[in-house]
Amino acid sequence: MKKIIALMLVLTLVAALAACTQVTRISVENPAEIKLEKAGGGVAVTLTENKTVSRITDVICQIPLQAAEATEDAWTYRITWLDADGKTITTVTLAGSQIRWEGQSYNLGVGVDLSVVTDVLETIPGLNK
């Protein structure tokens, strides 16, 4: 009986740990364009080239995210995906070392550095005036 109780306790702890480390990934279906905004100046750029839209979408959607409490009030970049009709699919905000998506703040998965994403965004013509 003690072995069964111990086994159940171990299984419960494993399940609890798995729930704590649940990874989320951003999902964007069929984007036609991306609107990039940089904080602190109202600068915005709309990207429509399929290759560029796909590349940015792929990079953002591959980042493993873990739900967390917000640690930053200020944001640096906002990325909005639009469909072919110009309607918003979803929006992601980069805030310090976190990503905000669908009303939730997320920490990046282990080994992911948000500066890599911001470095790419810094190279977008017209965004950094």
Give the predicted meaning of each segment.
Residues M1-A19:
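Sec-dependent bacterial lipoprotein signal peptides
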